[in-house]
């Protein structure tokens, strides 16, 4: 009882402090103050991100203040230019932890010195209190993922010469920043190939109080970040690197954490001990999925900048050995060559090689990012992949999927290739494929589920894409009124699978004219709409085809 009272009083104090700092033009991280820029943009000016101020702090370090529509306010971003100049630079997205800000890695973590002999452009955006999530603060929503994964890449593309190929997009962070790095990697495995987490909580469901406190420092109310961990479990899993670990197959993963103590002291750093246990759990989870990774549970180390500076340096040494660029003494490192790669290991800060966790891979026909880099069928050419998500709208490897649903759920978009895919979950779906098909040619679509089979034709648009809709099998288990049927939906409905098969129609020639149904807001008057019905009379898809 006493602990509950103290926690409630502490929560109120955190919210009061955050509100007071916001009114003064300051945000929850240190003393970041943008009041010198004047009032925040309004109207048309607030619809797009834009640079409000920029400064040159050193030969390599630049500081920007950017207005973000996703956040509804101006935040800071620091950028380190490559130590080894490049015509087109790979990018490290380096994230700070809770209680820090965009200046912390250069002010306290020696990021500028550690990257002096590297080819990377390092971008260090602000992350508020460090939730790396959408946070409801009063009537506002701070959408940090959109700022980090959409607006920051647009900012980089417009102002710097950078390479956006997945192999040249790297994520790293300390504490909550490492959580953000792993989460973004799991959300977008088609956009990033490297991710590192130093002393990070990677399983939110086993660290609920920590995430709740971080959200309150942002100004949110208690238990509003992802909702109740029991009633809204799917929302927590959808934001969990641990829950979405299957998506990390084929990426280069680095995990590290200190023990929470020093050799000369018996005192324990409980926070570092907690993230060490989280790292152990996450490593075990990756092993169970057959995902290669590097896990370094240090024998000493606290939750502080001494440890994180060491870990960043160790990770950069690993990159120097595994990636193809010239080091400070101008000796080239052969791509994927040397003792490190042949032995499948990573570097300790001392420079010694330790073995990677290389769990046996489960038997699967799925082609992941790793297979693609090693010469297997490319996903862009129709190679197979699978993807786990909690989003109702997502884009992955050129596929765009929209799911209409009543509640949060975890969806498996599985066995995806030019020949079709499978979907789990409830509601209805709309899918637009990449340009894998011959423009104008007719294809036979077959939607197979527990309720039956629905077959209909569809023509590829001028970009070689197919667009179609359908009902998911579990829709019949998704009642509006809670009760036993709701429990049945939770335990059974979401596990049911709907399969879509795509095959080229026999004896069909491409049409002279095609209608791009996915991009056109209007249909040519000469086109006729053919409605195909199924699933007890419900309209499943309308295929628009030119009149003969």
Indicate residue ranges for each PLM-predicted region:
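Non-catalytic cap/lid and distal C-terminal segments of serine-dependent acyl enzymes
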Residues: 4-425
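C-terminal beta-sandwich/jelly-roll accessory domains of carbohydrate-active enzymes
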Residues: 378-548
């Amino acid at each position: 009882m006493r602990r509950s009272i103290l926690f409630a009083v502490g929560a109120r104090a955190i919210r009061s402090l955050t509100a007071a700092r916001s009114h003064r033009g300051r945000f929850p991280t240190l003393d970041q103050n943008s009041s010198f820029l004047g009032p925040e943009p309004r109207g048309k000016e607030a619809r797009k991100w834009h640079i409000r101020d920029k400064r040159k702090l050193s030969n390599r370090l630049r500081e920007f203040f950017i207005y973000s529509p996703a956040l509804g306010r101006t935040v800071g971003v620091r950028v380190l230019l490559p130590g080894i100049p490049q015509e087109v630079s790979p990018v490290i997205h380096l994230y700070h932890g809770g209680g820090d800000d965009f200046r912390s890695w250069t002010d306290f973590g020696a990021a500028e010195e550690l990257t002096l002999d590297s080819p990377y452009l390092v971008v260090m955006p602000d992350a508020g209190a460090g939730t790396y999530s959408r946070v409801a603060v009063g009537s506002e929503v701070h959408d940090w993922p959109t700022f980090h994964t959409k607006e920051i890449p647009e900012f980089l593309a417009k102002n710097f010469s950078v390479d956006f190929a997945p192999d040249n997009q790297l994520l790293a962070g300390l504490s909550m920043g490492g959580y953000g790095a792993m989460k973004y990697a799991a959300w977008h495995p088609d956009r990033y190939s490297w991710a590192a987490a130093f002393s990070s909580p990677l399983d939110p469901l086993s660290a609920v109080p920590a995430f709740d406190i971080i959200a309150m420092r942002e100004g949110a109310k208690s238990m509003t970040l992802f909702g109740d961990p029991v009633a809204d479990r799917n929302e927590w899993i959808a934001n969990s690197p641990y829950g979405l670990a299957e998506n990390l197959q084929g990426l280069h993963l680095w995990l590290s954490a200190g023990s929470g103590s020093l050799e000369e002291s018996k005192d324990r750093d409980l926070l570092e001990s907690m993230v060490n246990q989280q790292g152990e759990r996450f490593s075990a989870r990756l092993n169970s999925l057959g995902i290669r990774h590097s896990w370094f549970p240090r024998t000493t180390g606290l939750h502080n900048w001494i440890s994180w500076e060491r870990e960043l340096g160790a990770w950069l040494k690993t990159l120097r050995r595994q990636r193809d660029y010239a080091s400070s003494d101008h000796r080239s490192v052969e791509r994927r060559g040397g003792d490190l790669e042949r032995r499948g290991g990573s570097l300790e800060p001392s420079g010694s090689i330790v073995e990677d966790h290389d769990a046996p891979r489960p038997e699967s026909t799925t082609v992941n990012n790793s297979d693609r880099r090693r010469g297997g069928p490319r996903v862009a050419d129709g190679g197979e992949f699978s993807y786990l998500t909690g989003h109702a709208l997502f884009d992955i490897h050129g596929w765009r999927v929209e799911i209409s649903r009543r509640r949060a759920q975890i969806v498996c978009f599985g066995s995806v290739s030019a020949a079709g895919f499978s979907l789990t979950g409830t509601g209805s779906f709309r899918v637009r494929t990449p340009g894998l098909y011959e423009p104008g040619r007719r294809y036979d679509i077959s939607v197979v589920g527990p309720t039956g089979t629905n077959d209909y034709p569809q023509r590829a648009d001028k970009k070689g894409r197919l667009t179609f809709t359908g009902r998911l099998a579990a829709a019949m288990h998704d009642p509006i009124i809670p009760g036993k049927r709701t429990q049945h939906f939770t335990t059974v409905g979401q596990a049911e699978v709907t399969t879509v098969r795509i095959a080229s129609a026999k004896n069909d020639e491409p049409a002279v004219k095609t209608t791009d149904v996915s991009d056109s807001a209007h249909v040519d008057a000469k086109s006729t709409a053919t409605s195909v019905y199924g699933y007890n009379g419900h309209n499943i898809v309308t295929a628009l085809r030119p009149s003969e």
